[in-house]
Amino acid sequence: MTQKEAIEYAINLAKKANENEIRPNPFVGAVIIDHEGQLIGEGYHQKLGGPHAEVYAIDQALQKTSDLSQATIYVSLEPCSHYGKTPPCVDLIIQHKIKKVVIASLDPNPKVASVAKLMEHGIEVEVVDDVSANLLNNRFFTNQLKNRPHYILKLASTIDGKIADYAKNSQWISSVASRQFVHDHLRANVDAIMTSYKTLVQDQASLTIRNTGGAIQEANVIVIDKNLELLEKQYESLPIFYPRSVTKIIFIAANPPSIQLPENTACIIGTFNEQGLVFSSIAAKLLELGYYKILTEAGSQLNSSMIQQNTADELYWFIAPSILNDLNAVPMLGLDTKITLDKKVQLSLIETKLIDQDVLLHYRFN
């Protein structure tokens, strides 16, 4: 097995994990190749608090040989060197005198710093900085480097960039298949769905997760509601207030509530300006609550505000094969700003996908 093949193998192993089972940890895969180029051990991180990829790979390799001093371990992410829920993987690599460690992606956590420790013990280290490995853990990197949740922005529009008609009717622009994709691949794989109270009132949304078989699953919902207007009696029958057993509605408001909050709800106090919520004011609290990855499904103003504040990390844009051709229709982005081309927001395309007759463009923000 070549180095390129081993790295690709480790990355594909890492992808086997269910992110909901490992978050906030990253995806990690590891393979061990002996001096003859044969695969003798492999593994991936499967569950938060469970063994790391390197542990599985080394345990498997030791079933075939007691001597790993001529072996190379390939890891999709830099091995940990600090105590967390499990012991450091670096110590295990050193203990078994593995000859070489090839790292596809460095860990941004300053506590890790395993490269220096490995080299101090005479172990050869090579960092290849693989693009696929870096993309795999973009959520983890956001959490570590920016100390905030990783935000995914979801948009569904006509070809001319409209998300609703002049009367604010938006149901439905995208196809049934596209909407199911959102449930299966986006809502089901985040810690919470973020929206605004205006969107909930306008769309009468429940923001649940509906699988292809029709079963409905609860989802945590974060509602940006500066003045807690959604708590007014006229809105108490909105679909979002369905009985919850394992999830919560988190309100983000400018001031504490003056009334008792409904069951399974909580309130975070954030800072607001003329353009809405200042996202940095709630970042630490959301991480504290365990919301590491958040999907935003909202209107044009919130979409624009997130982009302007450099808060959006990924964009899933569903483009329907239709045109409204109306200046009065609701645009997908909606801040009244005058931006010159030199200040445009740059994105990188990750994937394009045809879903029924809709086009899905998946981007990351640079």
List the model feature ranges, each with a label:
Residues I22-Q38:
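N-terminal glycine-rich anion-binding loops that anchor highly charged ligand groups
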Residues A30-I33, L155-I159:
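Short conserved beta-strand segments at catalytic cores or DNA/RNA-binding microdomains
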Residues D34-H35, K146, R364-N366:
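Active-site beta-strand termini and strand-to-loop segments that position acidic
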Residues T72, H150-I152:
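Structural preference for beta-strand elements that scaffold enzyme active sites
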